[in-house]
Amino acid sequence: MIQVLLVIICLAVFPYQGSCIILESENVNDYEIVYPKKLTVLPTGAMNSPHPCCDPVTCKPKKGEHCISGPCCRNCKFINSGTICKKARGDDMNDYCTGTTPDCPRNPYKD
């Protein structure tokens, strides 16, 4: 299974306006960290379109939305508690969404 890394970078384009750019990559090393004032061309794979969950001024979830991205975030809302966010491999155990965060917390019953 190929996992896609979503990195959200908020750039201050103008004093009162920002933009949320999402970089998609299978490998974090595909992208370099750039300073917003020096960014002229987006890296390969970057999408410079408004993210439906992101307030472009604050680069936080829009009013009424819970999250922007993450394994437990879908359509700007937290995924229901108890939903598997990471399937077990081998002797491992499944990890589950909590319903209160976009992150996939480690199962507390794991060693």
From Swiss-Prot:
GO terms for molecular function: toxin activity. It is found in: Secreted. PROSITE patterns: DISINTEGRIN_1, DISINTEGRIN_2. Residues 47-111 form the Disintegrin domain. The keyword Signal applies. Pfam families: Disintegrin. InterPro entries: Disintegrin_CS (IPR018358), Disintegrin_dom (IPR001762), Disintegrin_dom_sf (IPR036436). Heterodimer; disulfide-linked. Inhibits ADP-induced platelet aggregation in human platelet-rich plasma (IC(50) is 6 uM). This is Disintegrin DS-AC. A motif (Cell attachment site) lies at residues 89-91. Disulfide bonds join 53-76, 67-73, 72-97, 85-104. One of its GO terms (cellular component) is extracellular region. Residues 21-47 form a propeptide. It comes from Atheris chlorechis. The keyword Transcription does not apply.
